[in-house]
């Protein structure tokens, strides 16, 4: 196994949730030798401003990059052009009215608050949707001229995203931009919208103990995935220790 050069983690339910565990993760991260410490990427459904606010209220280490809106935004504080370069390859902003006209016929669906929306992410609540219902919504969107895909997680959160966007695609783009291999990357998460990170060829994964079955079932039995016996940030620490310590040392 190659050294870990980039670590991409979801926030809520993964490194965020229990502040004491989050503080232990920050301490662990700071204890890694600076010269070999991986780049830290937060990869959340939260929009970037929301993540920056969260950083002020919970004891997280500072990230090198922030991916927001389920892979539709990418930011680094000292590299403003990066965000534009990333979003420009995702295509034009959605027509919110077209999406709303499709969704109005879906029983039980409701629009999420404004803080979860932006031009390339239309987010809705829909409880316990099955695959057929999701496929039908996606087909109707495409029939109405909305070139989009659906990411559904937690049996509740439905995100309409550009065809080229999800948490995994954002990591692939960033790794390519940085010249880092996916086989030098570790990812961590707890729900279905994290699955796209785990599906990347060559990555190593950490699934926390409190993860939903939609992610655990995907990771079970895969040699490059570990399901940690601890929850949230404590599970992340265990998983990272496993993958960092299992790196081949040069002979």
Q: PLM features: residue spans?
A:
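Active-site phosphate-binding/coordination module
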Residues: 18, 23-114, 210
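Active-site metal-binding loops of divalent metal-dependent hydrolases
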Residues: 11, 46, 190-191
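Asp-based phosphoryl-transfer active-site loop
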Residues: 2-20, 198
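The start of beta-strands in P-loop NTPase/AAA+ ATPase cores
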Residues: 5-7, 64, 185
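Mg2+-dependent phosphoryl-transfer enzymes with acidic/Ser/Thr/Gly-rich catalytic loops
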Residues: 2, 22, 161, 168-251
């Amino acid at each position: 196994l190659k050294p870990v050069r980039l670590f991409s983690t979801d926030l809520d339910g993964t490194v965020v949730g229990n502040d004491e565990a989050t503080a232990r993760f920050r301490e662990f991260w700071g204890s890694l030798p600076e010269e070999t410490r991986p780049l830290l990427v937060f990869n959340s459904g939260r929009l970037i401003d929301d993540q920056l606010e969260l950083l002020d209220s919970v004891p997280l280490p500072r990230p090198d990059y922030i991916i927001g809106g389920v892979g539709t935004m990418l930011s680094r504080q000292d590299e403003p052009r990066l965000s534009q370069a990333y979003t420009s390859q995702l295509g034009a902003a959605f027509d919110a009215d077209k999406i709303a006209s499709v969704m109005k016929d879906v029983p039980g669906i409701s629009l999420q608050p404004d803080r979860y929306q932006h031009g390339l992410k239309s987010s809705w609540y829909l409880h316990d949707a099955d695959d057929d219902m999701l496929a039908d919504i996606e087909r109707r969107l495409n029939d109405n001229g909305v070139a989009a895909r659906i990411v559904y997680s937690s049996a509740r959160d439905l995100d309409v995203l550009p065809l080229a966007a999800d948490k995994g695609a954002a990591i692939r783009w960033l790794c390519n931009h940085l010249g880092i291999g996916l086989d030098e990357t570790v990812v961590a998460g707890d729900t279905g919208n994290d699955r796209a990170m785990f599906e990347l060829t060559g990555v190593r994964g950490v699934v926390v103990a409190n993860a939903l079955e939609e992610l655990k079932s995907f990771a079970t039995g895969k040699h490059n995935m570990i399901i940690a016996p601890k929850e949230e940030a404590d599970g992340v620490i265990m998983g990272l220790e496993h993958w960092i310590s299992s790196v081949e040392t040069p002979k």
